[in-house]
């Protein structure tokens, strides 16, 4: 059903990659590949039958799309997995310092482009600017359209609350508009836009001399994340009794 990370890169300092594979009964599978320069080092089988950790070494691999062959009994499944070339431009980037003036904002509450007010394929949600705890419809394009505003204020860095997918249904007049209930760590919430929209926003911000801080939450996730619905291991969460 899914492999995380969704792709990886050749040329990294650490050539080992850990893939978390999620799918029905995938724990029982053996995994192989004939992609040049890639070696499967080990498989780790977790408590849940629906997870498998695959450790690969890609030290001698070149960019391209590889086939991962999963075998379980008589069943065989080929899955494509992309190895991209490492973009070295980030080596020159500098993080924020005490010389920066940071402007923190919630993308849902800052500005709306009007493009992403109703997105299909998500759990039920409502956009209603009269309700303080429901979504108000702000998005990444709305922020991008107002980058000059930040220059006029004199700020030098933007800090958004998390923009990754929060696919939890509304509960009455309460929602996860704030972004702190991640359900996919590799996908921008489509109500804010796409991964490419985020890249474009960051690129345009840099052109205007603005740094961008990406807020990511790793010590908890949303109740709709697969890790909650089907825990990889019995001790995956420190306080599972809360679930």
Predicted segment positions?
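Short, solvent-exposed loop/linker segments at beta-strand-coil boundaries, enriched for Pro/Gly
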Residues: 34-42
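Extended acidic/polar, glycine-enriched regions
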Residues: 45-95
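Low-complexity, Pro/Ser/Thr- and charge-rich linker/hinge segments at domain boundaries
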Residues: 2, 83-104, 109
